Amino acid sequence: MKWSEICVHTTQLAVEAVSNLLHEVGAQGVVIEDVEDFDRMMAEDHFGEIWDVSDRETYPTSGVHVKAYVPASGDFQDLLSNLKKEIERLRTMLDIGSGDVTVAEIDEEDWAHSWKQYYKPVKISQQLTIVPLWEEYTPQPEENVILLDPGMAFGTGTHPTTMLCIQAIENYIREGDHVIDVGTGSGVLSIAAAKLGAASVKALDLDSVAVESARQNVETNGVGELVQVDTGDLLKGVEGEYDLVVANILADVILLFIEDAYARTKSGGRFITSGIIGEKRAEVTNALVAAGFEIEETRVMEDWVAIIAKKG
Ligand SMILES: C[S@@+](CC[C@H](N)C(=O)[O-])C[C@H]1O[C@@H](n2cnc3c(N)ncnc32)[C@H](O)[C@@H]1O
């Protein structure tokens, strides 16, 4: 079977929005080529083990390539013109850079290779290493491994917003904590919380593809007894209180449910929130404080911010 590779050249700021557009028009997986990510991974003691320096030549010298793979079937031209229209609409809201779209035809075998070749085992925090399900990997004795196949859900674990969240969870979680993960995607944050000592984790997502992916990943990692994955719209209908409320969703979505997050956080508990682009930091911080939280810490990676807010 022939597949088409669609490549959009964009900015780091617009990666998630462009990835979403590609998913919406029917892409079967997205590959992100960002030279800054590549250089960071190379610098983090995996040099030569996992990343091959010659791969760097395939990355754009500036900006980011978001690549997606779709069957080269009859309605491909409609899909492409829809995508281009949506990219132009996005341009009115966000700095998307050139937004240039290029197309290449590839064989299925190459597609499988292209989709997975950049997704390798990555140590994402002191204790946790994410390993793609299809990779053979022998962990070090102190390494705690999360096996992941995100499929079409967001959450390879290696996006800065996810890494910030997992590092904060590792820092603040206490043995026996009860955790809720809003917008679980592949389930990566919930699995991390379970592996780091949570007594229970409730994982919610609006998207049925994410719910299915999270359920599979939870089972693969043997934490099905601890993590309950359900469909849910933010914290609507959720009752009870949690030691940790975690959410890696865009700032504009976080702003919608800060008050609900406060209500669902135990006294002395924390709301760990990520997915906040730098320019939205003040707005989210102010809204957290207005809801009654104290800002305990703000972590930054590239253009992204995670805020750890405490309920006194
Ligand atoms: C940026 S991804 C984060 C995935 C994963 N938690 C991680 O950290 O990598 C955001 C997720 O939030 C979900 N989402 C968006 N709006 C939502 C809503 N209103 N209620 C629940 N989930 C939502 C999306 O479907 C997506 O899976």
From Swiss-Prot:
Biological process annotations from GO: methylation
A GO-annotated cellular component: cytoplasm
Enzyme class: transferase
E.C. no: 2.1.1.-
Organismal lineage: Bacteria, Bacillati, Bacillota, Bacilli, Bacillales
Transmembrane segments: none
The protein, known as: Ribosomal protein L11 methyltransferase
GO molecular function, one term: protein-lysine N-methyltransferase activity
Chief localization: cytoplasm
Summary of the function given for this chain in its UniProt record: Methylates ribosomal protein L11.
Reaction(s) the record says it catalyses: L-lysyl-[protein] + 3 S-adenosyl-L-methionine = N(6),N(6),N(6)-trimethyl-L-lysyl-[protein] + 3 S-adenosyl-L-homocysteine + 3 H(+)
Similarity comment: family membership: Belongs to the methyltransferase superfamily. PrmA family.
Compartments where located: Cytoplasm
